[in-house]
Amino acid sequence: MGDGLTPEGKAQLITRNLQEVLGEDKMKEILKERPLRIYWGTATTGKPHVAYFVPMSKIADFLKAGCEVTILFADLHAYLDNMKAPWDLLELRTRYYEQVIQAMLQSIGVPLERLRFIRGTEFQLSKEYTLDVYRLSSVVTQHDAKKAGAEVVKQVEHPLLSGLLYPGLQALDEEYLKVDAQFGGVDQRKIFTFAEKYLPALGYAKRIHLMNPMVPGLTGAKMSSSEEESKIDLLDSPADVKKKLKKAFCEPGNIENNGVLSFVRHVLFPLKSEFVVLRDEKFGGNKTYTDFETLEKDFTEQLVHPGDLKASVEKALNKLLDPIREKFNSPEMKKLSNDAYPGASKQKTVPKGSTKNSGPEEIDPSLLDLRVGKILSVRQHPDADSLYVESVDVGEENPRCVVSGLVQYVPSDQLLGRSVVLLCNLKPQKMRGIESQGMLLCASTEGEQKQVEPLDPPTGSAPGERIYIEGYENGEPEGELKPKKKVFEKLQVDFRISDDLCAQWKGKNFLTKLGSVTCKTLRGGSIS
């Protein structure tokens, strides 16, 4: 592979979709003479998720460019990083990573025989390597070591010495793996510049560094193994993929922190060179895109609906995940997964002051500040065809400005003067330039044609009247929900419309002092 490419063509393939390259001139000089030697390392900690397809797709690019690629399973690093992988599980998690990474590569058509796989402990425990760790520790300052690991090593109030060693070992790996370049996420940049500064101090060459952008998670922040809501696991079922994508942040016209759109850019396009948006015939039918820029432009101009984008990504993603699911469906692989991550599906945060046996923490629905609102005015968002801007009376001195994506589902005349259910303690968020100070709760059902209906408070309810969940009427709402805690997202999973059209959480009705909150027709619908 790469034989038919010029050095310039190889460089273009190596660097496409990267956010930054340090040492590009040196890379181009090497490519004129021989294949570039690159390594990518992954600490064997939490379960790999779909964002790992980003480096996998780049590894495919490296091989197409004729590079010699090494994949390092950094087992010792996993232990040094605040023992994210306990010593007794290190071997099992490393085996899990080996199996799942190889399955990912095979699912995108990467030939494994052209890759070199190695574990960190195969060379990091040698006499020579250990001596270099000591040599490095004699020239590195504590400040530089801590700064280098700030974006990668888990930050705690009282950092362990092991976390300060972590960047130095990653720098030494470049020398001991005999590579020209290290590839990683842009979150590794401080470690890369640390290596460029300190390897020459030991008499070793400064390496090239290739950095891919970090793909936003489903909630808009970085995709993380430790945040269940932010990522899709490689072994998630098709139903789980659908559920998580449905909840994913994908605001109409908004391309910032859009994990769904970023996945198309950094994984699906590099692998297939085209992407098909699946649409109903009445909305123009399927549309094939051969470059990401056109898709991004159409999404920005709201010619591509978030629901259609999610459905299309769901289909493409399941196609990638199916071979991995099949491999891990064997008894041997199921045992490995369970042994490497014992009780992973059952682990919950233990509330302060309780014991491990007190059961999983249940988030109190009274933390939500739900109120009756009355819509005083409705207008079209000036910069978004799918959004309304509403003025809503919630019993305060001034009405609240609320932005909602109901244009396609509810005519404006059906909203004007209507009593609604408003979530009032979300952090205000700008939507296409206008700050929304609440969320209008609606019931919805999926199908050939999505249906959406605003929830209805009991007749006679006054603006500002509190809405609570049956049995939780005495709790106090939070002043403002902290986005990182994802209180609403965790509760919303269990919001449903009952058979008798009542809004419920885990079978308990939404209530005011006048009765139950209802929905007109959408039995079994979800609420968001």
UniProtKB/Swiss-Prot annotation:
Record GO terms (molecular function)? ATP binding; tRNA binding; tyrosine-tRNA ligase activity
**GO CC field:** cytoplasm; nucleus
Q: Keywords of this protein's UniProt record, alphabetized?
A: Aminoacyl-tRNA synthetase, ATP-binding, Cytoplasm, Ligase, Nucleotide-binding, Nucleus, Protein biosynthesis, RNA-binding, tRNA-binding
Task: Tell me the compartments it is located in.
Answer: Cytoplasm; Nucleus
Q: Name one Pfam family in it.
A: tRNA_bind
Which one GO biological process term can you cite for this protein?
Answer: tyrosyl-tRNA aminoacylation
Among InterPro entries, the record links this protein to: aa-tRNA-synth_Ic (IPR002305), NA-bd_OB-fold (IPR012340), Rossmann-like_a/b/a_fold (IPR014729), tRNA-bd_dom (IPR002547), Tyr-tRNA-ligase (IPR002307), Tyrosine-tRNA_ligase_regulator (IPR051270)
Q: Which reaction does it catalyse?
A: tRNA(Tyr) + L-tyrosine + ATP = L-tyrosyl-tRNA(Tyr) + AMP + diphosphate + H(+)
- The record places the motif ('HIGH' region) at 44-52
Q: Which stretches make up the tRNA-binding domain?
A: 364-468
What PROSITE patterns does UniProt report for this protein, alphabetically? Answer: TRBD
The sequence motif named Nuclear localization signal is recorded at: 242-247
Q: What is its EC number?
A: 6.1.1.1
Q: Compositional bias (Polar residues) at which positions? A: 346-358
**Principal place where this protein is found?**
cytoplasm
| Positions of L-tyrosine binding | 39, 166, 170, 173, 188
Top-rank taxon, per record: Eukaryota
| Domain comment (free text) | The nuclear localization signal, which mediates localization to the nucleus, is also important for interacting with tRNA(Tyr), suggesting that it is sterically blocked when tRNA(Tyr) is bound.
Q: Which family does it belong to?
A: Belongs to the class-I aminoacyl-tRNA synthetase family.
Matches recorded under PANTHER family: TRNA-AMINOACYLATION COFACTOR ARC1 FAMILY MEMBER, TYROSINE--TRNA LIGASE, CYTOPLASMIC
- Relate the assembly described in the record: Homodimer.
Role according to the record: Catalyzes the attachment of tyrosine to tRNA(Tyr) in a two-step reaction: tyrosine is first activated by ATP to form Tyr-AMP and then transferred to the acceptor end of tRNA(Tyr).
Task: Give the protein name, as stated in the record.
Answer: Tyrosine--tRNA ligase, cytoplasmic
Q: Which organism is it from?
A: Xenopus tropicalis
Q: Which gene encodes it?
A: yars1
